[in-house]
Amino acid sequence: MVGFNRRFAPQVQKVKALLAGAPGPKAFVMTVNAGAIPANHWTQDPAVGGGRLLGEGCHFVDLLRFLAGAPIAAHTAVAIDAATRDSVSVTLMFEDGSIGTLHYLANGSKAFPKERLEVFAAGRVLQLDNFRRLTGFGWPGFSKLNLWQQDKGQHACAQAFVQAVRTGGGSPIPLAELLEIGRVSIEIEESLR
């Protein structure tokens, strides 16, 4: 199993549950203030670390795919820095009409949160800040879900895998989705070359 842990985070699970009751297409805005890494760092080397989009950015493609609950129908991407391609804006279009933008940026301030997700659906908004604060705007019966410490779902992801192995159950992330995320992430990376 690929460790796409963010989909297992408790606040993401809450977002998914809330979206189940929101009719129509959704719009997702994922901002990742990833920070700069030198061009000669191993994560920037496509042969070793795969590059930052393949190495880390794919996690956010997975997160948006999970929340949309529909396959990715099309995608576009642009990058600021041609040398490292680590300040990227990606647009995803989903088969259900939902859209998502991923802003994976290496040129921001460390004073700004690293990961922020905004979801717009059915006249309502959800905002997840750094996997600590989830705030709802216009959601009947829901206004916030805050955690004492950040939880990006690593433990729940590992638990789901172990449980599947113990019980002989299916993969916690369907193989078709894993292959789709991998294919789309590679296509995005290749489109930036």
What are these regions (language model features)?
Residues 10, 14-17, 63, 89, ...:
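Alpha-helical elements of Rossmann-like donor-binding domains used by nucleotide-donor carbohydrate transfer enzymes
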